[in-house]
From Swiss-Prot:
Origin: domain of life: Bacteria
CC per GO annotation: cytosol; riboflavin synthase complex
GO biological process: riboflavin biosynthetic process
Record-given protein name: 6,7-dimethyl-8-ribityllumazine synthase
Active site (record annotation): 93
Catalytic function, reaction form: (2S)-2-hydroxy-3-oxobutyl phosphate + 5-amino-6-(D-ribitylamino)uracil = 6,7-dimethyl-8-(1-D-ribityl)lumazine + phosphate + 2 H2O + H(+)
Organism classification: Bacteria, Bacillati, Cyanobacteriota, Cyanophyceae, Synechococcales
InterPro entries: LS, LS/RS, LS/RS_sf
Protein task: Catalyzes the formation of 6,7-dimethyl-8-ribityllumazine by condensation of 5-amino-6-(D-ribitylamino)uracil with 3,4-dihydroxy-2-butanone 4-phosphate. This is the penultimate step in the biosynthesis of riboflavin.
E.C. designation(s): 2.5.1.78
Length: 158
């Protein structure tokens, strides 16, 4: 039996893009901070002039799939991370945004054979989003760790 899994100890050769939705930036900035902290602690160059890491800002979570498609098609990155925060309101817009963004991102990942970490928080309240972006824990850290594991796993499978 063969057992293959991703590792977190050699991120020095990975090219990573983080695509961040500006909408609800109080939350997405915190997620980005947690994400960068994790990447840095695992050996990724996160400096301003980093050849390893690019950060791309989009207006909202609906725009994430299109930009992921553009980035994935370049073949430059081993993994993409999406960050967003969609908070339920009084209209069905919440369901439309999360359904379309998640389906679009999953489709891009399958079509291009690149891992894309879905780091879009979907919460009922701002308080719940804040708890997941730093008050209780920062899921940005988890998304970065998932990205490193998936990039490593894909490398091992090739």
């Amino acid at each position: 039996m063969v057992s293959i899994e991703g590792r977190f100890n050699d991120a020095s050769n990975f090219r990573i893009a983080i695509v961040v939705a500006r909408f609800n930036d109080l939350i997405t900035n915190k997620l980005l901070s947690g994400c960068i902290d994790c990447l840095q602690r695992h050996g990724v160059d996160t400096s301003e002039s980093s050849p390893q890491l690019d950060i791309i800002w989009v207006p909202g979570s609906m725009e994430l799939p299109l930009i992921c498609q553009s980035l994935a098609s370049k073949g430059k990155y081993q993994v993409l991370i999406t960050l967003g925060a969609v908070i339920r309101g009084d209209t069905p817009h919440f369901e439309v945004v999360i359904n379309e963004s998640s389906k679009g991102i999953a489709s891009v990942a399958r079509e291009n054979g690149i891992p894309i970490i879905y780091g879009v928080l979907t919460t009922d309240t701002m308080q719940q989003a804040l708890e997941r972006a730093g008050i209780k824990s920062n899921l940005g850290w988890n998304y970065a760790l998932q990205a490193l594991e998936m990039a490593s796993l894909m490398k091992a499978l090739r």
